[in-house]
Regions:
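Short beta-strand scaffold segments in enzyme catalytic cores
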Residues: 70-75
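Nucleotide/phosphate-binding catalytic cleft detector across ATP-hydrolyzing
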Residues: 1-61, 78-191
């Protein structure tokens, strides 16, 4: 997530704390970042990448974070963050269909999603959910062509909803961002 920071608060914390690590584009990281615009890179995306690389070092990795947006982050062995893709998340897609059309209702996900919708509501659910599943599996399949040994992490608020729907093997880790934040902190305070 990219947010504005309170410079006054940061100055106060730096003054009051013995050690203060602020996650920005200048912080030391245990991975190499080849992302073209590090200043605009979401801190959650960066932390998830660091977390995945910490859990499976030296591997080719794809991190899928399924939340408000769905992000796809590629880490090439031995720990090079190449970049990724961003698409609308499930709730965002449901809301967009409702907001940008005149008559489509706002629906939410259900446990049982048909392949073919039999009503407007189930057609929206099937379109959104199955579309995301095909998108995720599509990215995984394409990356496995280049990286046959690819390991995939799935995290984010909707990760458990999608983990059982994907045809590809994945590691679901709801705490991947927190793992990455902790690793960044450790990396910056090691003596």
């Amino acid at each position: 997530t990219v947010i504005d920071t309170d410079d006054e608060l940061i100055a106060y914390l730096k003054n009051k704390l013995q050690r203060f690590v602020f996650l920005d584009e200048h912080v030391a990281l245990p991975i190499k970042v080849e992302y073209g615009t590090p200043k605009t890179l979401g801190k959650d995306r960066l932390a998830a990448v660091v977390g995945a690389n910490y859990l499976r070092p030296g591997k080719n990795l794809l991190v899928i974070d399924a939340g408000t947006a769905i992000t796809y982050e590629v880490i090439e062995a031995p720990g090079i963050f190449l970049g990724g893709n961003i698409s609308p998340g499930m709730t965002t897609r449901f809301r967009a269909l409702n907001h940008f059309t005149k008559k489509l209702p706002l629906v939410t996900e259900e446990d049982d999603i048909p392949l073919i919708g039999r009503s407007t509501e189930t057609a929206i659910q099937a379109g959104v959910v199955n579309g995301i599943v095909y998108e995720m599996d599509g990215y995984i399949d394409e990356l496995k062509v280049k990286y046959p040994d690819l390991l995939v992490f799935l995290t984010g608020g909707h990760s458990f909803y999608f983990e059982r729907r994907l045809k590809n093997s994945i590691f679901a880790d709801i705490n991947l961002v927190l793992t990455g934040l902790n690793r960044i902190l450790e990396y910056n305070v090691e003596d």
